[in-house]
Design a protein with these regions (language model features):
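ABC-family P-loop ATPase nucleotide-binding domains
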Residues: 26-82
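A short, surface-exposed alpha-helical micro-motif characterized by mixed small hydrophobic
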Residues: 136-138
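Helical segment within the ABC ATPase nucleotide-binding domain
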Residues: 109-122
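H-loop/switch region of ABC-family ATPase nucleotide-binding domains
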Residues: 130-131
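Catalytic Walker B motif of ABC-type/P-loop ATPase nucleotide-binding domains
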Residues: 95-99, 104
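Conserved ABC transporter NBD signature motif
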Residues: 1-13, 17-18, 155
Length: 186
């Protein structure tokens, strides 16, 4: 129930305008798997008003993604990194991350925290769904728990006080809900 308003645009009634402002990273997205990251950028970038191949190059370098390798050869973690690079290349105002660290090795998971902080420093809003509490413990400034479509709590990180996020989640008997699940609800 309710509406989703993004940068003043109703997601249901002004979808085309809203989608230009939002990037989604989810393991369920697909690209031209037989193409390279750069080829995908050239083919798909035309659908985004603020697309920048220069940004794609910068993000591919930053995330150490091979530019000339077909995407089907990527590991799950590399595929998620590519999605982040692609998403940032159309310079969104909001970034929706659906289980973004799935498949990341422990070393990159640590780097990911810094990357998300850099994105937030650019004043890009970040909404992340995850079941890995350590991911949000370090970077979240506002935490919401949605259990089977129902909002269980919504608090600033500071308002949690001495309570851990894990503690609150366990008290609610949480079931996993992804960003994609939320966007499907009418």
């Amino acid at each position: 129930q309710g509406e989703v308003i993004i940068a003043g645009k109703n997601l249901r009634t002004e979808y085309e305008e809203a989608k230009q402002k939002v990037a989604l990273v989810s393991e369920k997205l697909s690209y031209f798997m037989d193409k390279t990251p750069l080829e995908n950028g050239e083919l798909l970038g035309v659908y985004f008003e603020r697309w920048s191949m220069e940004e794609l190059y910068l993000w591919l370098d930053r995330l150490e993604i091979p530019k000339g390798q077909p995407i089907y050869q990527f590991s799950k973690g590399m595929y998620m990194k590519y999605q982040l690079a692609f998403a940032m290349s159309y310079q969104p105002e909001f970034l929706l991350l659906d289980e973004p660290t799935a498949g990341f090795d422990p070393v990159f998971r640590k780097d990911f925290t810094g990357i998300i902080q850099d994105i937030r420093d650019r004043e890009i809003g970040v909404l992340m769904s995850t079941h890995i509490i350590s991911d949000i413990d370090q970077i979240a400034d506002y935490i919401m728990l949605i259990d089977d479509g129902e909002l269980k709590f919504s608090k600033t990180r500071e308002a949690l006080g001495n309570h851990s996020i894990q503690e609150l989640i366990e008290q609610c008997g949480h079931k996993k809900t992804t960003v994609r699940d939320l966007l499907r609800r009418e």
